[in-house]
Amino acid sequence: MIAAMMVLGATSAFAGDSDALKAVLKAKTYADAKALVEQNLGSMANDAEKAKAYNHLVELSMKQFNDQQSIIQMNQITKKNDPVDMEAMNEGAYNALVAAQECYKYDQLPNAKGKIAPKYDNNAERVWNARIQLVSAGDDARTKNNTTLALKYWNAWFNSESSPLFNKIPAEKKAEPYKEQVAFLGAWLSKENKDMAQALKYCDVAMNSDEYKKQALSIKLEVLKGDLKTHEDSLKYINNLKDLYAKDAKNEILLDNLNSMFASMRM
């Protein structure tokens, strides 16, 4: 009995990858691997397998990104002008960032022994440059009037800054002098795209810049104000103005808006 249990335990401890994971790891393209991950994730043996599957997505998408980046670098060195597939490069960067965050999520969960033993901590450094590429990718899409694509790339870049995946990235490396400018543009695009929650997030960052503070505040007030269809909407907007004014009592724009609302509400 004991011997049989030991055999079963040994079999479990040294079991190979599940068929679901093997199928993912055999995939040679990101599209095929992603489809298999979505199809087979629930059939994988444990969280470690899920992390391994998402890491395979990181590898495939980073190859797509790095292949095009290498052409750019060689063009600079050799003074050639070999074609670069920027669409493939940008999509590779985006997919790598998304997959790395999913990999991290499963990689940080306790194993069967209750211990956290991450295997893919290097993904943070690995995808950092890909993350930064999304700033240029979003701006390129913006100049081509592709708002949806611009926000896809910028939102991924912006929202991932607070991801625990990047907790160990040095502060000096995280410094991004263009952040407030992109946040301002992102706020405006998000408002136009009716994504008000994301617009407010961008506004809060853009308002940290003297250059964009006034314009970002105007966008924020427009978003907070909304349509003011009901009395409750107006009261909510007034309370939002009060909260902002309490933090910036010298701001005449906020004071003017408050006085205007008080007058309209006969308060």
Regions found by a protein language model. Give the residues of each.
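Generic helix N-cap/helix-start motif at coil->alpha-helix transitions
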Residues: 14-17, 129-136, 175-185, 210-220, ...
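Start-of-domain marker
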Residues: 14-69
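Structural register within alpha-helical repeat arrays
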Residues: 20, 40, 50, 57, ...
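Residue at a conserved register position within TPR or TPR-like alpha-solenoid repeats
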Residues: 24, 61, 141, 183, ...
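Structural motif corresponding to the intra-repeat A-B loop/turn of tetratricopeptide repeats
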Residues: 27, 57, 64, 144, ...
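Alpha-solenoid helical repeat scaffolds
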Residues: 38, 98-101, 155, 204, ...
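Short coil turns that delineate tetratricopeptide repeat
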Residues: 45-48, 108, 162, 211-212, ...
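Short coil/linker segments at helix-helix boundaries
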Residues: 62-148, 152, 156-180, 197, ...
